[in-house]
């Protein structure tokens, strides 16, 4: 599989603060990668480093085959790191025409990209008349003018209303379906779950998980249990290796499964050991629960 970006032991310090710590992961062609983490986890710093706008402290990264200089590699990259920033008194077409001149791209690309982001009918409207969602879509059109191999987006739906969020997510999926690799930073769990094929989870600059999204959420699930004797039930669950993390809140026990097991089998196991349940529900563990487990201090 063709490699787009390789990051090895990347570290960035701002004085005494370590924003990114010994981070390594690889991005392969054709996938949608999400860097997921709470605010301050190092997502934007990581993107800034690979785009050469933030200097790394140590470690390294390589674009494409590893023999391409960062300067040349970035010609194949489209990126939106800050909020969309165009001349407000110029039309969408005029703004993109200016970008084409800077990037050395033919003007014929403008209508093609405006149509892709569903703004062709507003090509002659001034940027200052656009909604925030439209501004973000215009920024994506701008980033795609040079037909990049990878599109990098930092919090692409931040500040948008539900309709704008849906439009941007649908656009990301459309762009990915056409073969463009995408790397996005987000603190929104459902965003990563809906649009990404792979996820890198960060907390305080450290990688907690890296891999396919579907593998992360294909765990064995968890059980919600209640019994009249909560302490006895807790002691039994803790003695069995098929149960991982166990927590109790207001008499409701949540037990995460380390092995496949259905509710019927659990009920029988407990009954055979003299424990009668008053409540038993098996649930599928969502990306949110996985994320909260990983980032739990």
Where does each model-flagged region fall?
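ABC transporter nucleotide-binding domain
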Residues: 169-254
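Short low-complexity, flexible loop/linker segments enriched in glycine and/or proline
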Residues: 200, 293-296
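Generic structural signal for individual residues within well-ordered alpha-helical segments
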Residues: 74, 96, 111, 166, ...
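C-terminal end-of-chain micro-motif
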Residues: 11, 296-297
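ABC transporter nucleotide-binding domains
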Residues: 2-5, 12-184, 189-203, 209
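Structural motif detector for alpha-helix initiation sites
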Residues: 92, 213, 284-288
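Short, charged/small-residue-rich alpha-helical element at the C-terminal edge
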Residues: 222-294
């Amino acid at each position: 599989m063709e490699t787009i970006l390789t990051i090895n032991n990347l570290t960035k310090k701002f004085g005494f603060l370590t924003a990114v710590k010994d981070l390594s992961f690889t991005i392969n062609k054709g996938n949608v990668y999400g860097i997921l983490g709470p605010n301050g986890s190092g997502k934007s710093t990581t993107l800034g480093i690979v785009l050469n706008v933030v200097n790394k402290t140590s470690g390294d990264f390589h674009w494409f085959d590893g023999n391409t200089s960062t300067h040349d590699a970035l010609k194949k990259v489209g990126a939106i790191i800050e909020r969309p920033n165009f001349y407000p008194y110029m039309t969408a077409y005029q703004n993109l025409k200016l970008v084409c001149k800077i990037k050395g791209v033919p003007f014929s690309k403008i209508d093609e990209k405006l149509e892709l982001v569903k703004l062709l009918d507003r090509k002659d409207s001034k940027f200052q008349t656009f909604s925030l969602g439209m501004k973000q879509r215009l920024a994506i059109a701008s980033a795609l003018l040079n037909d990049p191999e990878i599109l990098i987006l930092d919090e692409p739906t931040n500040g948008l209303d539900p309709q704008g969020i849906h439009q941007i997510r649908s656009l990301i999926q459309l762009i990915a379906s056409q073969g463009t690799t995408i790397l996005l930073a987000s603190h929104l769990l459902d965003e990563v779950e809906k649009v990404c094929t792979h996820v890198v989870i960060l907390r305080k600059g450290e990688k907690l998980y890296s891999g396919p999204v579907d593998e992360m959420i294909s765990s064995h699930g968890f059980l919600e249990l209640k019994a009249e004797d909560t302490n006895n039930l807790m002691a039994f669950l803790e003695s069995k290796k098929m149960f991982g993390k166990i927590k109790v809140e207001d008499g409701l026990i949540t037990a995460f499964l380390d092995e496949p097991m259905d509710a019927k089998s659990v009920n029988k196991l407990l009954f055979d050991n003299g424990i009668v349940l008053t409540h038993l529900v098996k649930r599928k563990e969502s990306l949110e629960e996985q994320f909260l487990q990983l980032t739990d201090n």
